[in-house]
């Protein structure tokens, strides 16, 4: 970010269709893993704040679920509502799109972003993979026509290409404000929430297309005992068949999930972690508004 004598602070919404690179972008800006990622759409389910303070500038990023068309369950409605709500009361909107690909879900996000009154930045992701940059021009010109007042910044969320320019532009749009959070705080989310998300990420990465999205993780115990952090996590699925898939042959799969999650937790929490995982069937939870609220999904 640019150095400035003025103290600046504001909220920055990161929006886009599922699996376009929003969470990867947030993690790279923060310089550490905070938001979970996988190649599967709809990995992110909640708005999460990622806070970066650099000098006089504090940018508070809101990582959002990908807006999507398919899915009529209560969980899908929650995710779309959550993402749309992030466009309100923020100071800057980053609309992440692919370098060439445009889908109906991109169009759905665009139609919401067009109503935004404040600054909009189009972050064109994965542009480092294009050898001849002139191939980008037709897509960029079309996008500029859809959002005439938006700034366009080509980036690579994965490799960090051009993120310094993106952050500098964001900083220039933030209002003069005292900082809302302490300098060393990087998120508004609890350690329990982050632990649950890491377990869910490893499940999605291990299973891929084998497992539908009717899965969530609840932390039942989170306790520091001496130098070891003891975490008990409950994995909720909707059918017995899903439970068997997660556990795997002789428990091999759930052991790999636990091992991978524990490794990331130890880095995040800077502590030795003892992680225990259980799998429980709770039929229909993803379409049960009361169950969703009890699991921390808020109002639907």
UniProtKB/Swiss-Prot annotation:
Q: Which is one Gene Ontology cellular component term of this protein?
A: plasma membrane
Annotated region (G3) at: 63-66
Major site of localization recorded for this protein: cytoplasm
Sorted alphabetically, the Gene Ontology BP terms of this entry are:
ribosomal small subunit assembly
Task: Kindly list the places in or outside the cell where this protein is found, as annotated in its UniProt entry.
Answer: Cytoplasm; Cell inner membrane
KH type-2 domain location: 199-283
Where are the residues of the annotated region G4?
A: 125-128
Query: Which stretches make up the Era-type G domain?
Result: 8-176
Q: Which residues bind GTP?
A: 16-23, 63-67, 125-128
Stored Pfam families: KH_2 (PF07650), MMR_HSR1 (PF01926)
Q: Where is this region: G2?
A: 42-46
Question: Which molecular-function annotations from GO does this UniProt entry contain?
Answer: GTP binding; GTPase activity; ribosomal small subunit binding; small ribosomal subunit rRNA binding
Region named G1: 16-23
Q: What does this protein do?
A: An essential GTPase that binds both GDP and GTP, with rapid nucleotide exchange. Plays a role in 16S rRNA processing and 30S ribosomal subunit biogenesis and possibly also in cell cycle regulation and energy metabolism.
Q: How does it assemble?
A: Monomer.
What name has this protein been given in UniProt?
GTPase Era
Q: What is the lineage of its organism?
A: Bacteria, Pseudomonadati, Pseudomonadota, Gammaproteobacteria, Pseudomonadales
